[in-house]
Amino acid sequence: MTRVEYKHTEIAVKKKLGQNFLTDRNITRKIVAASGAGSQDRILEIGPGFGALTREILEVCPAFTVVEKDRALAAFIRQEYPQLQLIEADFLDIDLERLAAGGPLRVLGNIPYSITTPILFKLLENRRSITSATLMMQHEVAARLVATPSTKEYGILAVQLQTFCDVRYLFKVGRKVFRPQPNVDSAVISMVPKKNVAVEDAQAFSRFVRTAFHQRRKTLYNNLKDAYMLQAVDEGTLKLRAEALSIEKLADLFKLVQPLPAGEPPMKRDGRR
């Protein structure tokens, strides 16, 4: 079992929580600077750990909120930074809308590899409650977030986030600046919710995107025919794979299709059932 000690606290690293602690202060300074965080912001830090990022945020904002699930680390933060509002809980379980009742949140964090995708989707679902999110995550996941069409990285995650947020890959972080050292490199990204989006029904669009990318090697027709009415879509588009369409084209396609009523047979290419 790997153990990490800092000041008066020693913990057994929990792999299931994806715990890798950042040790390079230059990196934490870059993250805070890139976030644009200031004294007037309502800041939320996800998973402060031993406070590497926390102490840098305090340089620009004297009081903010942190969410920490690990009991020992929560006790450390409570003792080391009593001026902070500590929520000892799983970030995935907290009510972001309620937390943002006083104004939208600027989110920062070195987030666990193991739950990166659920965290991103929670932020996406609660995008009206945040100003921005500046997050460190596994490099491969960061690359998927900013992927472009017709690449192997381009998929559900890229489409969902880029439809509703401006996403930027900021910089890469090598694995040697963490304790314990992970087997992969990391990267820092930023996501800012868009004010105007091409899609109104986010949940319906999410279902559509998941269906369109369900089997990447299949055409849009084969992935969508059992779930949507496709009469309004030209045959040339239906012969393509989802990965070939830009964010804008997928949004346009979504507007053309209608969910297939329960019990209706799938659509044939000629428009008949």
UniProtKB/Swiss-Prot annotation:
Sequence positions that bind S-adenosyl-L-methionine: 20, 22, 47, 68, 90, 110
GO molecular function, one term: RNA binding
A Gene Ontology term for the protein's cellular component: cytosol
Family per record: Belongs to the class I-like SAM-binding methyltransferase superfamily. rRNA adenine N(6)-methyltransferase family. RsmA subfamily.
NCBIfam families, A to Z: ksgA (TIGR00755)
Function: Specifically dimethylates two adjacent adenosines (A1518 and A1519) in the loop of a conserved hairpin near the 3'-end of 16S rRNA in the 30S particle. May play a critical role in biogenesis of 30S subunits.
Annotated protein name in UniProt: Ribosomal RNA small subunit methyltransferase A
Protein encoded by which gene: rsmA
